């Protein structure tokens, strides 16, 4: 990611709004074409200038940024246009969705607003030429370039979601389990509801099934409330009042550990105590608003509601929770001055907060992304809070099935009596499943089966060996077959004169200067075949090196001369005269490429 980070740094003063947060992902360094890589290194160097730089240097910097934006915009246009002079807006949005990004993504607001304005004001019928397209995407060019170059955490998102959809359909046929009946409002839930949404740490989204129907978080709010309390109060203070160990008992037991505090924040007693710690100096309304604002930020400001009917139902039928509250009060488990009834009220309110699978998946992705919301880039929770929360979800999140779930699935998760399961794949994605029928342990029957099938197909289990787990798929990597064919595909496109394919490759994970076993580049092949349009694209759009030598010491110009392609000879001679690559730059480029190759091997 060094080159992209350099670009983001260079563009920050130009008003780029597509910042992204997340923990690092190995082997995701873009292999830009020679010219683009050269511009990026210039931008990175100029980004390190001191505040006392002279005005001409700033002008050069602005010019370099403008050229860099223009080049990336052109490459993006060529990739989507596939040889056409204008792009229909619907074609762009379709290609965008294939990467996993949604047109409603907050990070793409500027781009989508500009395209909407173009449609309203232009008579072109929703068609974008190169200049207009570049203007529309310029504010979000970094994010879009990452998306179309497949530099997100899941590169082949369509293939991955195809597998997810097949698992979803398999699990849909399950009919076991019963809807929770001890809370009257929950008893009215439709047992046929079945939905799954996912959101990656890069903001790639996918939903299947009933994913827009609101449901109450219930116990899924427990890890979120705990994370908020750790972020605001710190680990040491919170764990004076609640433990960290699985209880081995039912989640609603009147039981404390040897220290006289609730076993963990995932059982009712622990969740009630954690609720009592939040904003102790505020009234009930202020406490609820405080937590709701946090939850909204975690969900990227997507759907968040409140079911007053469920809240009233909880209060009317919550005798067990009242008993737990009085038990905690008698054992002096609350901080001094805490109103036990106010703590219970807040607990009931938080359990009655509504989300959809879609907004819930963003909350899970915020946990997967170290506390940074992937679709807004806002830092919501501290890294310490996320680490603690995921640890407890892993050991205590699935009621009495927690040990079995940790064994078979090996991922942090939290279930709820509403039929929801919040699942986190750290550093990769978050998921929210909804299916009201519960098994005998109180977990969603379809939800747990889906999680097990997901981990049996993909190497997401905490202890799957990423290097040697040959029987499982790793969606974080491009397929070995694809990587092995990149050189063949590139050179065949150059051989056959397929400029459209080369345009697509320019924004894929492909270096346009890579060589075959004879050290021949695409420019060598195009020059030998006399494909003038291919040569133009490689030297004008990709700025490839015309001095690359094959195993016989020939450069592309030599091949054009040998096969008497006079137009290509003239074009390459003019390009060689204008192409300058100093020894220092060449050494730096070679060192950077060597380092990238080394990192990809580690």
From Swiss-Prot:
Start-end of each ANK repeat: 518-547, 552-581
N6-succinyllysine PTM sites in chain numbering: 253
UniProt catalytic activity: L-glutamine + H2O = L-glutamate + NH4(+)
Residue spans of biased composition, Basic and acidic residues class: 49-64
Signal peptide: none
GO MF term set: glutaminase activity
Residue range covered by the transit peptide: 1-14
SUPFAM superfamilies: Ankyrin repeat, beta-lactamase/transpeptidase-like
PROSITE patterns named in the record: ANK_REP_REGION (PS50297), ANK_REPEAT (PS50088)
EC number: 3.5.1.2
GO cellular component: mitochondrial matrix; mitochondrion
Ranges where the record places region Disordered: 1-67
Chain positions with N6-acetyllysine modification: 279, 284, 329
InterPro entries hit by this protein: Ankyrin_rpt, Ankyrin_rpt-contain_sf, Beta-lactam/transpept-like, Glutaminase, Glutaminase_EF-hand
One Pfam family this sequence matches: Ank_2
Chain positions recorded as substrate binding sites: 219, 268, 314, 321, 347, 399, 417
Enzyme class: hydrolase
Tissues of expression: Highly expressed in liver. Expressed in brain and pancreas. Not observed in heart, placenta, lung, skeletal muscle and kidney. Expression is significantly reduced in hepatocellular carcinomas.
Keywords from the named record: Acetylation, ANK repeat, Hydrolase, Mitochondrion, Repeat, Transit peptide
GO biological process, one term: amino acid metabolic process
Compartment(s) where it occurs, according to its Swiss-Prot or TrEMBL record: Mitochondrion
PANTHER family: GLUTAMINASE (PTHR12544), GLUTAMINASE LIVER ISOFORM, MITOCHONDRIAL (PTHR12544:SF33)
Function: Plays an important role in the regulation of glutamine catabolism. Promotes mitochondrial respiration and increases ATP generation in cells by catalyzing the synthesis of glutamate and alpha-ketoglutarate. Increases cellular anti-oxidant function via NADH and glutathione production. May play a role in preventing tumor proliferation.
Family in the record: Belongs to the glutaminase family.
Protein name: Glutaminase liver isoform, mitochondrial
């Amino acid at each position: 990611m060094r080159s992209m980070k350099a670009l983001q740094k260079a563009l920050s003063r130009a008003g780029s709004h597509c910042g992204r947060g997340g923990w690092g992902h190995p082997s995701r360094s873009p292999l830009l074409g020679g010219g683009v890589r050269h511009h990026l290194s210039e931008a990175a160097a100029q980004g390190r200038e001191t505040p006392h730089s002279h005005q001409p240097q700033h002008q050069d910097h602005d010019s370099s940024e403008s050229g860099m934006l223009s080049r990336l915009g052109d490459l993006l246009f060529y990739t989507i246009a596939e040889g056409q002079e204008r792009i229909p807006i619907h074609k762009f949005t379709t290609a965008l969705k294939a990467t996993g990004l949604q047109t409603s993504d907050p990070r793409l607001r500027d781009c989508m607003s500009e395209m909407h304005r173009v449609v309203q004001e232009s008579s072109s019928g929703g068609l974008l030429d190169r200049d207009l397209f570049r203007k529309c995407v310029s504010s979000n060019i970094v994010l879009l370039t990452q998306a179309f170059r497949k530099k997100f955490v899941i590169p082949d998102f369509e293939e991955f979601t195809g597998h997810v959809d097949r698992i979803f359909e398999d699990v849909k046929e399950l009919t076991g389990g019963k809807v929770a009946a001890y809370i009257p409002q929950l008893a009215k839930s439709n047992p046929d509801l079945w939905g799954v949404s996912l959101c990656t740490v890069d903001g790639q989204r996918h939903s299947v099934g009933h994913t827009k129907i609101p449901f109450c978080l219930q116990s899924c709010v427990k890890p979120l409330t705990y994370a908020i309390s750790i972020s605001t109060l710190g680990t040491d203070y919170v764990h004076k009042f609640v433990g960290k160990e699985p209880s081995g008992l039912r989640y609603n037991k009147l039981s404390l550990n040897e220290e006289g505090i609730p076993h963990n924040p995932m059982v009712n007693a622990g969740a009630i105590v954690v609720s009592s710690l939040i904003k102790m100096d505020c009234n009930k309304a202020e406490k609820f608003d405080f937590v709701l604002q946090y939850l909204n930020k975690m969900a990227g400001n997507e759907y968040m509601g409140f079911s007053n009917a469920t809240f009233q139902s909880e209060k009317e039928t919550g005798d067990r929770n009242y008993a737990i509250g009085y038990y905690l009060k008698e054992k002096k488990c609350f901080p001094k001055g805490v109103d036990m009834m106010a703590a219970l009220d807040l607990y009931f309110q938080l359990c009655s907060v509504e989300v959809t699978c879609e907004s819930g998946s963003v909350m899970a992705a915020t946990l997967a992304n170290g506390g940074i919301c992937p679709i807004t880039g806002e830092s919501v929770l501290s890294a310490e809070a996320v680490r603690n929360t995921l640890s407890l979800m892993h050991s205590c999140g699935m009621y009495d099935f927690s040990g079995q779930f940790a064994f078979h699935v090996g991922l942090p998760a939290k279930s709820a009596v509403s039929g929801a399961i919040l699942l986190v794949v750290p550093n990769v994605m978050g998921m929210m499943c909804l299916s009201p029928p519960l098994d005998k342990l109180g977990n969603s029957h379809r939800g747990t089966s889906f999680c097990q099938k997901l981990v049996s197909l993909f190497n997401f289990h905490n202890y799957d060996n990423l290097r040697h787990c040959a029987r499982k798929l790793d969606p974080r990597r491009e397929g070995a077959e694809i990587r092995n064919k990149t050189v063949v595909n590139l050179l065949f496109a150059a051989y056959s004169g397929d400029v459209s394919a080369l345009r697509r490759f320019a924004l894929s994970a492909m270096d346009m200067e890579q060589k075959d076993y004879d050290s021949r580049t695409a420019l060598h092949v195009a020059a030998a075949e006399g494909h003038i349009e291919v040569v133009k694209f490689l030297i004008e759009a990709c700025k490839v090196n015309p001095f690359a030598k094959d195993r016989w010491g020939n450069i592309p110009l030599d091949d054009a001369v040998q096969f008497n392609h006079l137009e290509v000879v003239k074009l390459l001679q003019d390009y060689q005269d204008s192409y300058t690559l100093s020894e220092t730059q060449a050494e730096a480029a070679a060192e950077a490429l060597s380092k990238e190759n080394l990192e990809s091997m580690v």
